[in-house]
Curated annotation (Swiss-Prot):
NCBIfam families: L29. This is Large ribosomal subunit protein uL29. Belongs to the universal ribosomal protein uL29 family. Keywords: Ribonucleoprotein, Ribosomal protein. The gene is rpl29. Residues 32-51 are annotated as: Disordered. GO terms for molecular function: structural constituent of ribosome. It comes from Methanococcus maripaludis (strain DSM 14266 / JCM 13030 / NBRC 101832 / S2 / LL).
Length: 71
């Protein structure tokens, strides 16, 4: 999966964000298994970038929830 920018994430609905998080977590788990079994990662920075993307999505979801509560 490509890196998602904050502006791209903001355009998604909450349900789409949840789907992206699930997809990214599966990808992260697959990379983690590959790493733990001693395999060489296809892209060494992919694990950390995937974690950052998940955090970015969760942050924007919280922003949307807070915005909905205040409105």
């Amino acid at each position: 999966m490509a890196i998602l920018k904050a502006s791209e994430i903001r355009e998604l609905s909450v349900e789409e964000m949840k789907g992206k998080i699930a997809e990214l977590k599966r990808e992260l788990m697959k990379e983690g298994v590959n790493k733990s079994t001693g395999g060489a990662p296809s892209n060494p920075g992919k694990i950390s970038e995937t974690k950052r993307t998940i955090a970015r999505i969760l942050t924007i979801m919280k922003e949307k929830e807070a915005q909905a509560e205040n409105a």
